[in-house]
Every structure is written in C-alpha cells, then in structure tokens.
A protein has these predicted regions:
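Accessory N-terminal region flanking or inserted into the helicase ATPase core
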Residues: 209-248, 255, 262-265, 369-453
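Active-site-adjacent loop/helix micro-motif of nuclease/hydrolase catalytic cores
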Residues: 86-92, 371, 642, 655-660
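A short, compositionally biased micro-patch
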Residues: 48, 57-61, 69, 516, ...
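Conserved helicase motor core of SF1/SF2 NTP-dependent helicases
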Residues: 243, 247-293, 300-344, 348, ...
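Short amphipathic alpha-helical boundary/capping segments
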Residues: 12-15, 240-245, 359-366
Length: 706
C-alpha cells in the first residue's frame, strides 16, 4: 500500500485546535501503518463531485478527507477539519491525472463545471468580447503547460493580467506559472525550459494515479510517507513546506550530477537557500553516503550559519546532520589555524583604526593622497591580490579604482602599507583576509587532506577572491565538489571576485532561478528599482540582470510615510503594527528593520510606548518563532530571514545611505560601489517581506526613495 500526504493536509493540520491535535496525530500514525485497519471507517462524501473522496472519523469533532481510487492500494490524506467544513471542502474538489503532463492535479469542481457550462453557452451564441490574452497560444500548448482540458475555456476567457490573477485559484500551480510567463512575453519553448517541462508531449494514463505521484509537478503538492520517522518530521513542523515540496527546477538543481563546481544565481525569494539546504542533504544522503564522508556548508556571516544550521536540523535526521559541518568561513579559518598553533589573532575595527593612524604618519604630503585613499587602496588592490612587496605593487593592476596614480606615487605610498603590515605583525594581528590566505597556503604547502567531499556555499556574492581560493583548496577537484548559490544584487559587503580566476571553473554548470515565491510583485518591483541602471556581476566576470525575475503573487503597493518628526514616526510605528495585528497578523510575523543599532533602539522604544511585546533578533542568535513579540533587527541581521510584514524605519537622509559608509574621498568608483552596497542593503530588507512592506522616516528622507 502507498500512503501520501498533501500540502493542503499539512496546512489544515496546523490549524487544528491544540486540544484535538494529539487525537488527529494518533489517527495519522495509525493511517500510515495501515490505511485498511479495522478501526478506520470510510464513508463516501455524498455530495462530492469526485467519487474517490471519502470521509474518515477521527473523533466527535474532526474528520479527515481521503482520496482512494477504486481498485488501487493508493491512499492520500488530503484535508482535515471540523465535520461540516471537511465535507464542504471535499464537495468542492476533484482529483485528475493530467493526460498531457502526467501530474496529479487538484481542481475546484465549481471552476470545472463553470467552464463546461461556458462551452455550452458559447456554442449557442458567441457574444462579442475582447481578444483573449492567450489568443495566439494553441490549445495543445496550453495543455502541455498543465492546463486541464476542462479549464481551457477558462483560459480562453482571460482578457488581461488582472483576469489571470483572478483565475489563479482555479488553475493548478504549474499551469498558472506557465501562463504568467507567457503573459510576460516569453515564447512557449522558453517557458518549457524555465519550468523544466519536457520539450516533447507526454502521454499519460489518466487512470494511473500511483504513477502520477512520481511526476515532478505532483511532488510539489504530495509526499509519499514511507516510515514513522518521516511522518513525525512532517507533523512536527507542518508549515515548513519548503522541507518537502520543491519546484521541479529546484528539484533538478538539488539532484544535478555535476561534473565539477556548480553555480546557481537568483533574485531574492527564488529559493536559492532552500536549494542549497536540500543539495547538502542530497550530497550526504546519496552522493557521499559513507559514514566517514563529510560536507562543509559555509557562508559569510555567523548569523546566516546559525540560521542554516537550524534549518538543516528540521530537514535532516541526526545521522545526516552529523556529517554536515555548518560554519561561516571566518570561524572555520580561525578554528583551523588555532588547531595548528597559529600565533596571530584577528584585528578588529577599533584596533585597526589605531594602527592606520600610526602608519599614515609616514604618508608623504607631496603626493596629495588622502587617508581614505590609502585604506581603500589596501582593501581594493593590495589585500585582494596578496601583495607583499613594492615590486609586486608596482606591477599590480588597479582595476576598479577611480584614482589614477603613477609609478612615483606608488613608490611614495608603499612605506605606509609596509608600516601598517609591520604594526599588525608586531601586535600579533592579522586581517581576516590574511588569515584566509595563510590557511590556504598551509593546506597547499603541507598537502593537508581535509575530511570534506564537497563544499556548499550560501550567499556566495559576499565572499572575497581569497575566500574562493581557499574553498577550492578544501576539496579535491571532482564531480559535485563545490555548489554555490548567490545573487550580487544582494551584495552588502565590499568583496567582489571572479570564480574562474580563483580556480573554480563553472563553465557549462551555471543556472538561474527567476520565479520569486516569497515577495509580492509590488514589493519586488519597488525593490528592483533601487538597483536599476547599476552594473551587477554574475560572480564569474560577466554581468547579471533581473530579466525574467518575477513574482507570482500580488498585494498592496509599498507605502512610504514621510513624517515630520521622530515623535511622529514613533507614534506611526506603534499605530501601524497595531493595525496589522488587528487585521489578523501574528506579532511574530512582523519585523521592523533599522539601518543601525541606534535606529533599532528607537524602534524598540516605539513598540514599548505602544505597549507591544517585542523580540530583538540579535547577531549570532536565531529568530526563535516560539518567542512572542514583534521582531526588531538591523538590516544586516534580517538577511536570509522572511516575514509576512516588514517595516523599514528611519529611512532618513544620512541614515540610508549611511553617511559613514559613503565616505570615499575623491575615488568615484569606490563611491559608486559604496552607494550600490547601500542600495542593495535596502533591497535585501524590503524583500524579506511576503505580504506587505512599509518605509517610514522623518525630516529629510533617503534620496533612494525619489
């Protein structure tokens, strides 16, 4: 017998009253063991349009709805609810195998009947109407995209994008996505490739529901439950659908048999991190299954590493998780070097500033070079290239620098850099990029063999070239060795790198995710305009764009509130959060974001003044959803998180962009990059929102807001 659970069932289970969940859970466990057990009584749903739907009694209040085709051993748990509500749900649904795609689809019975009735009416008299949105698309193409034959008339009646949105609930998800892309101007072949559809038509048996469950589109909404452990994991976190249900394109990337490093790009909300998490699980479970095999999952910040580890705990069992090491790269380097007697410690900003002041005392005034120039030259030229002598500096390219200097100026400037390096050494200090370089050189010179079979990298856009060289040294070159996901539109740190120049060859192994499943189109559009006209790299020497990057949901436009004073903003924040909660939003689904810690303190004061509970998501701490309260965090901290509602507070001039971050002296290139980074930070903050985004400020507002 084959038992499966739908995504709808899990969502419905999460809404079951706590006093009944234990009873429902006991029923599900019994059902998985044997759906034909004597204690399970099946009752046909009398008014159901689908004869394969049955009601099963759980207790006096609750009923489960089961799809069980006659003469099969297939049992699908599709819904759970109070008695009358469960029956009403079953009466509204029909289950079909799409003969053109092979997917098991759940359709609204009313929509099917309405479409069939419309065909009858249209045959009697065809009233004049506007040309349809899909008038140029043939029926067989619509069917190949997953449009049920019964709903082709519904699609033909769609006149514009608003009509398409109104028809969304009636259509299978894969059909809606294809129609959305067609409406956006993509040709049929491009849509087939983007959605991982076969280029040739598929002939499927419409009565074979068991085979249909294996279809990639079916796996977006149904999961076959094979054992009690897997079932328990599902029921423990029924709302974490990302753990089980993947888009076919995501599923393909997760299991790709890569003959070397692989790179995945994608805008905010396209599921890059979800792909990386599932990829790590796939690697230890399938590609490198030996008990001694290890995978390194790394990212740029401790915050993200903490969040990733928490997510992997929900995705992997203890045995698999024990073979995935999750750590941000700087921490890995520190641990690696410390274990080998490394005598240097990382230098932090306060110490570094003092050392720079000492070194700048050697700067010759005749060159006219500012103190900002020296620090930027160090960060942009000397450190990325690992320059350690004047001779190397004289020969080094200075790509990306706006201030031109000749040989004489380089010779005059070098003593400053040499002195800064000398002072670091005297105090037993190194910058992190030096430590990364030292770790790589130690591995290469001593031939150290590390236990890792593969490395998975999240937020790759924030890694430096030296970091990528180290990553290349961590694992031997071979199939499925390195898997990177990133998006340079979300680069909020200064590093840039070209993978190919770091020994990571991704030629022929690079893909892009374009469908945003998190953010509404209104939020996406607002965020995208922040970076329009700015060249964004693809991590490998080329340019990336957001062509085809689109959201499949809609909602309210982003609101910008320009208040007169700090007191006015304080009152507004409290009032707006209360309005969201009154409309049904959970406080934990709301996050107020600030550019600086000072702004975060202002937000906390505003929430306290409104008598609202709050929970600050701090650095190196996870967002524990069990903790009550409106979330408050810095822009940097919310990277990698998501919320239903996001408010960006104090979007004032000199705060966004932050005045300190914009200091670039006379270097126009550094200034442009700094502004792009500040714009990217606001882009990241806004795209954490799933349903609504609001920006507020007082006095002079951020120039980014127009």
């Amino acid at each position: 017998m084959k038992v499966a659970i739908s995504d709808d069932f899990l969502l419905a289970f999460s809404d079951v009253q706590k006093t009944h969940q234990k009873k429902v859970r006991e029923f599900i466990e019994l059902f998985r063991e044997n759906p034909e057990a004597g204690g399970i009584q099946y009752h046909p749903v009398r008014k159901a349009r689908d004869p394969n739907l049955y009601s099963v009694r759980i207790d006096q209040a609750y009923r489960a709805i089961v799809f069980h085709p006659a003469d099969t051993d297939l049992y699908l748990l599709t819904w759970v609810d109070h008695h009358d509500d469960a029956y009403a749900w079953a009466e509204r649904k029909v289950f079909r195998v799409n003969p053109m795609t092979g997917a098991l689809q759940v359709l609204a019975a009313d929509a099917v009947e309405a479409a069939e009735a419309a065909v009858i009416v249209s045959k009697k008299a065809a009233p004049a109407r506007k040309a349809g949105l899909f008038r140029k698309v043939k029926d067989d193409v619509l069917l190949r995209f997953g449009v049920p034959v019964e709903l082709v008339p519904t699609v033909r009646a769609i006149d514009d994008e608003e009509g398409l949105e109104e028809s969304r609930e009636a259509l299978p998800q894969e059909a809606y996505e294809a129609l959305y892309l067609l409406a956006a101007g993509y040709d049929a072949d491009t849509v087939l490739r983007e959605l991982e559809k076969p280029m040739e038509p598929v002939a499927a048996d419409p009565t074979d529901f068991t085979t249909a469950l294996q279809n990639d589109d079916s796996k977006r909404r149904f999961v076959v439950v094979s054992d009690a452990k897997e079932l328990a994991e599902l029921l423990n976190a029924p709302l974490d659908l990302w753990r089980v249900f993947l888009h076919p394109k995501q599923r393909k990337l997760v299991s790709v048999a890569a003959n070397g490093p692989y790179r995945v790009l994608g805008g905010a909300g396209t599921g890059k991190t979800v792909v990386a998490l599932h990829r790590a699980k796939h690697l230890v479970e399938t590609v490198f299954p030996a008990s001694t095999d290890r995978i390194l999952f790394t990212t740029f910040t401790r915050n993200l590493a903490t969040d990733i580890h928490e997510n992997l705990k929900t995705l992997c069992g203890p045995e698999l998780l024990s073979r995935i090491e999750v750590v941000n790269l700087d921490a890995w380097v520190s641990n690696f070097l410390k274990a080998r007697g490394y005598r240097f410690e990382p230098v932090f900003d306060g110490e570094g500033n003092e050392l720079w002041e000492n070194a700048l005392a050697l700067a010759p005034p005749e060159t006219g070079l500012s103190s900002d120039f020296y620090r930027q030259e160090w960060d942009e030229v000397i450190q990325p290239q690992g320059l350690s002598s004047l001779d190397e500096y004289l020969k080094a390219p200075r790509l990306g620098r706006g201030t031109k200097i000749g040989r004489a100026a380089r010779e005059a400037a070098w003593p400053v850099f040499r002195e800064y390096r000398s002072q670091l050494t005297e105090r037993g200090k190194r910058e992190y990029i030096d430590m990364i370089r030292d770790a790589r050189q130690l591995i290469e010179k001593q031939g150290i063999r590390l236990p890792y079979k593969a490395v998975v990298v999240d937020e790759a856009q924030d890694m430096s070239a030296e970091a990528f060289r180290l990553i290349r040294a961590l694992v031997p070159a071979g199939p499925s060795d390195i898997f990177l996901v990133g998006d340079a539109h979300q680069r909020i740190y200064r590093y840039r790198a070209t993978l190919g120049k770091c020994g990571i060859d991704i030629r022929g192994r690079a893909r892009k995710l374009r469908l945003n499943y998190r953010t509404t189109d209104e939020i996406r559009r607002f965020a995208v305009t922040l970076l329009e006209g700015r060249p964004i790299d693809d991590l490998d020497g080329g340019l990336d764009d957001q062509q085809g990057y689109m959201s499949l949901t809609h909602g309210p436009k982003v609101e910008v509130h320009r208040l007169k004073s700090l007191a006015d903003e304080t009152a507004f924040l409290g009032r707006h959060v209360k309005d969201l909660i009154a409309s049904g939003a959970a406080p934990e689904s709301i996050c107020i974001v600030g550019r600086t810690k000072h702004v975060v303190e202002h937000v906390k004061d505003a929430l306290r003044a409104a008598s609202l509970d709050l929970y600050e998501v701090k650095r190196e701490a996870t967002d524990k959803r069990s903790r009550p309260g409106v979330r408050v965090a810095t822009m940097h901290r919310v990277k990698g998180l998501e919320f239903d509602h996001v408010l960006v507070a104090s979007a004032n001039d000199k705060i966004i962009p932050l005045e300190k971050a914009m200091k670039a002296g006379d270097d126009v290139v550094v200034a442009r990059n700094a502004e792009t980074g500040e714009r990217a930070l606001l882009y990241v903050a806004l795209t954490r929102a799933k349903k609504s985004a609001v920006v507020s400020g007082w006095g002079a507002m951020s120039p980014f807001l127009g």
